[in-house]
């Protein structure tokens, strides 16, 4: 059967109606039989190790445990595809359908959804315009609620009554001379469902809009909050009573597996225990209702069913946490979804991707700001397709298999090809958590020995990285478009300013600041070569390199360009006239020789070899 391609624009998460939940789990077999309801708490038969019928692993509901094999073994081949066994009712198909086929449990009494009851904010409490404490009192069978005050003068709609108050009113209703009628009182999730059903959302929305226009302050904020919830219900075409469950879905069995261990014992998902509690209590409640058990016993069983469903959806949200063996809290549906180890963050957002790697970062002070050091071992793995392509294209290798063998043997040719491949091919480095766009930047890779990624110290503030064991991920942009985009938009040398403040984020720090200070510092104790004259800057640096002048020694260097010098007086400290008519003016940091008519012949600047080195470095960088 050809797979149909389904295109969609977005995924919408909304409340599911009881009919929708039944549709998820209910299927009509080719023989007309409707299956889907899980009615037994059993999982597998411990003697035959086969799933129990109508249980949590039922093959009739969820599909066969083995490919193309029914429960009783009558059909065992792919040629029987699609047949439903007459004896056991199992459809002959692939076992992987057990990863997506759902079931459902029909509840003997309605149950409030704990997310909407105990969530922050409580949507049920907001919609009913009642305090959360009162709603909880109703749901957990501590208080009655008036659903219809009838002709009783003292009763009000949604008023809470305790046991004694209700008994008193009941006595009045059934008294011989009583004229009370139309009084309706409820308790538990059934009463809550009735209250939610009575809500007319459109009318409430109109009424709230009028009240908001007339009110202010705290009251107005509360009304707006309620209106927002009501408008969302209207917008998604959901009904408030759907927050009370009559049917609960059973997730596919392969998502809550049961596996046999070496010693013959079984390891099972916590969900199976939570589902088993729900089914046991549900079946017991149905039986009690059948035999018309006393109201107090039925009510207690309904409360226990509510608590069992609460634990299944979100264990520990309300009441005592349900624990398994060795007092470990059981993992509910919410626990599987939420948090760092949950389905979204761990498996969907945090999944491993191809052409990516991860390693510890170390400082690479010899790198340029747009470069990173990539370990050879990692690079050959990441760029393997490009290397194989280049080998086949240029080096008379005939096929991929041959090229892979060369790579496995670490042939010297491979490293030359890898060097060619990575030249001009940027890689992207990412450090979690990526809190702003500079958390992922592009670099040109340089092959390095070892197993650590080398990073330029100036890009650390953008990544909020340091070298105390931080790890970073590498990603390779594959297409030409992706490479061009990485180079133009994401290269580290183009991300100098912070997107948040507009201030420079690449600023010298630590060793760099210390080095600049040390080069330009004054040290009166540095006397070696002090006072010497040099014809140009290069001569002074050469003298320092030969060791004849200290780094901080004051020397005079001929420099005929413009010199800016703060704190220097316009008046010379001394003026000396020579026999040839020239005049030498000495300032604090300059010595200028001029002709009689003021024409400059030469200028010497008082500086240190360190300052010359600093000036040359900055000047070279600015020119390039």
From Swiss-Prot:
Keywords: DNA-directed RNA polymerase, Magnesium, Metal-binding, Nucleotidyltransferase, Transcription, Transferase, Zinc. Gene3D superfamilies: 1.10.40.90, 2.40.40.20, RNA polymerase II, clamp domain (4.10.860.120), RNA polymerase Rpb1, domain 3 (1.10.274.100). Its EC number is 2.7.7.6. GO terms for molecular function: DNA binding; DNA-directed RNA polymerase activity; magnesium ion binding; zinc ion binding. Pfam families: RNA_pol_Rpb1_1, RNA_pol_Rpb1_2, RNA_pol_Rpb1_3. Binds 1 Mg(2+) ion per subunit. Binds 1 Zn(2+) ion per subunit. HAMAP family: RNApol_bact_RpoC1. DNA-dependent RNA polymerase catalyzes the transcription of DNA into RNA using the four ribonucleoside triphosphates as substrates. In cyanobacteria the RNAP catalytic core is composed of 2 alpha, 1 beta, 1 beta', 1 gamma and 1 omega subunit. When a sigma factor is associated with the core the holoenzyme is formed, which can initiate transcription. This is DNA-directed RNA polymerase subunit gamma. It comes from Synechococcus elongatus (strain ATCC 33912 / PCC 7942 / FACHB-805) (Anacystis nidulans R2).
């Amino acid at each position: 059967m050809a797979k149909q391609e389904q295109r969609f624009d977005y995924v919408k998460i909304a409340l599911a109606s009881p009919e929708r939940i039944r549709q998820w789990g209910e299927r009509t077999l080719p023989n007309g039989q409707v299956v889907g309801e899980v009615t037994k708490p059993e999982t597998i038969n411990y003697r035959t190790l086969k799933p129990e019928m109508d249980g949590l692993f039922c093959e009739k509901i969820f599909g066969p445990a083995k490919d193309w094999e029914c429960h009783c073994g009558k059909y065992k081949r792919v040629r029987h595809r699609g047949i439903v066994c007459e004896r056991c009712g199992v459809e002959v198909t692939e076992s992987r359908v057990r990863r997506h086929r759902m079931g459902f449990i029909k509840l003997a009494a309605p149950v409030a959804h704990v997310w909407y009851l105990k969530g922050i904010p409580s949507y049920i409490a907001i919609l009913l315009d009642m305090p959360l404490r009162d709603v909880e009192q109703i749901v957990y069978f501590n208080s009655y609620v008036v659903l219809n005050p009838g002709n009783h003068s003292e009763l009000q709609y949604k008023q809470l009554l305790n046991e004694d108050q209700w008994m008193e009113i009941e006595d009045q209703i059934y008294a011989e001379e009583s004229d009370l009628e139309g009084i309706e009182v409820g308790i538990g999730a059934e009463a809550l469902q009735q209250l939610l059903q009575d809500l007319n959302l459109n009318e409430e929305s109109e009424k709230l809009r009028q009240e908001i226009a007339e009110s202010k302050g705290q009251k107005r904020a509360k009304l707006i909050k309620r209106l927002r919830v009501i408008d969302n219900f209207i917008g998604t075409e959901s009904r408030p009573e759907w927050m009370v469950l009559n049917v609960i879905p059973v997730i596919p069995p392969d998502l809550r597996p049961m596996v046999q261990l070496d010693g013959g014992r079984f390891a099972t998902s916590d969900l199976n225990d939570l589902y088993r509690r729900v089914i046991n209590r549900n079946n017991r409640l149905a039986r009690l209702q059948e035999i018309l058990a006393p109201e107090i016993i039925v009510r207690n069983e309904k409360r226990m069913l509510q608590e069992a469903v609460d634990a299944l959806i979100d264990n520990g949200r309300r009441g005592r946490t349900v624990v398994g063996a060795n007092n470990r809290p059981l993992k509910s549906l919410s626990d599987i979804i939420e948090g760092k180890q949950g389905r979204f963050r761990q498996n969907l957002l945090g999944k491993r991707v191809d052409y990516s790697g991860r390693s510890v970062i170390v400082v690479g002070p010899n790198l340029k700001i747009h470069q990173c050091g990539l370990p050879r071992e990692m690079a050959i793995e990441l760029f393997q397709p490009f290397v194989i392509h280049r080998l086949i294209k240029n080096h008379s290798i005939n096929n991929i298999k041959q090229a892979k063998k060369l790579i496995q043997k670490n042939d010297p040719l491979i490293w030359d090809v890898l060097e060619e491949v990575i030249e001009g091919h940027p890689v992207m480095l990412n450090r979690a958590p990526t809190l702003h766009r500079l958390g992922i930047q592009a670099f040109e890779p340089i092959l390095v020995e070892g197993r650590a990624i080398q990073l330029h110290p100036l890009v650390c503030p953008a990544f909020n990285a340091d070298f105390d064991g931080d790890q970073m991920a590498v990603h390779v942009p594959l297409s030409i478009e992706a490479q061009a985009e990485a180079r133009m938009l994401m290269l580290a040398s183009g991300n100098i300013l912070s997107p948040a403040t507009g201030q420079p984020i690449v600023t010298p720090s630590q060793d760099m600041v210390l080095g600049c200070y040390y080069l330009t510092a004054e040290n009166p104790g540095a006397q070696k070569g002090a006072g010497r004259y040099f014809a140009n800057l290069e001569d002074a640096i050469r003298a320092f390199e030969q060791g004849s002048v200290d780094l901080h020694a004051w020397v005079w260097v001929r420099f005929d360009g413009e010199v800016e010098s703060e704190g220097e007086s316009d008046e010379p400290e001394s003026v000396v006239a020579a026999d040839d008519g020239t005049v030498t003016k000495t300032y604090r940091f300059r010595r200028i020789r001029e002709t009689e008519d003021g024409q400059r012949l030469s200028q010497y600047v008082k500086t240190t070899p360190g300052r010359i080195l600093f000036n040359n470095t900055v000047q070279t960088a600015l020119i390039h």
